[in-house]
């Protein structure tokens, strides 16, 4: 999963929009259309997950059409920037997409701005270790798949992940660093479904052991 966060800034910089501004500008862009595509934005509101007030992710669905006919629906989740995540935005070249666009006669896509991978990893470590409460059960088994794939392409240091993670856990204040991954009921089936066709550990048990070893290595790392 590629993440593009939002900060609490204002208009003028595409990387520093509020959730409301992003929604309004996204809806306007869909109405205006691009290369035969257009769409309508449906706002589904905040996602019910444990998070400090003002930092819960927001779910939008873009219902797309192409040249007047139905094309598909894309789910977009946005969240405010945390712990300096936008200080250094990373860009991913859209190489595969560029080939597809060329075959379809569409304009060449620009590089995709993303949340730095160290921040994405820290957020997923936080998400899959967040304790349950009376109103919410942690179902984030899929993060164990995402983490394996992310670590495979991550080129930074474990110390960088630790720095981000410590600040993130402190800012959110939901549970302490370092955490432990604990499997919940239903995780085994969810992990198996998410892992289909991917080069990741075959069982949930293996993935939990791997994730907790990773957490120990990150916590022991130093700059």
What are these regions (language model features)?
Residues 2-8, 13-223:
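Structured mid-to-C-terminal alpha-helical surface segments
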């Amino acid at each position: 999963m590629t993440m593009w966060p939002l900060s609490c800034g204002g208009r003028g910089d595409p990387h520093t929009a509020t959730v409301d501004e992003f929604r309004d500008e996204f809806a306007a862009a869909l109405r205006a259309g691009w290369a035969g595509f257009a769409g309508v934005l449906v706002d589904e509101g905040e996602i019910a997950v444990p998070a400090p007030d003002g930092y819960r992710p927001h779910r939008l669905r873009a219902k797309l059409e192409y040249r007047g006919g139905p094309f598909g629906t894309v789910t977009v989740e946005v969240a405010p920037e945390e712990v300096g995540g936008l200080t250094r935005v990373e860009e991913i070249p859209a190489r595969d997409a560029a080939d597809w666009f060329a075959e379809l006669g569409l304009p060449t896509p620009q590089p995709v701005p993303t949340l730095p991978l160290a921040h994405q990893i820290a957020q997923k470590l936080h998400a899959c270790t967040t304790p349950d409460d009376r109103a919410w059960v942690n179902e984030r088994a899929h993060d164990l798949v995402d983490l394996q794939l992310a670590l495979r392409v991550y080129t930074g240091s474990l110390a960088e992940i630790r720095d981000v993670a410590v600040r993130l856990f402190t800012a959110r204040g939901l549970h302490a660093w370092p955490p432990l991954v604990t499997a919940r009921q239903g995780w085994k089936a969810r992990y198996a479904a998410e892992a289909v066709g991917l080069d990741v550990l075959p069982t949930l048990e293996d993935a939990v052991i791997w994730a907790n070893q990773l957490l120990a290595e990150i916590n022991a790392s130093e700059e």
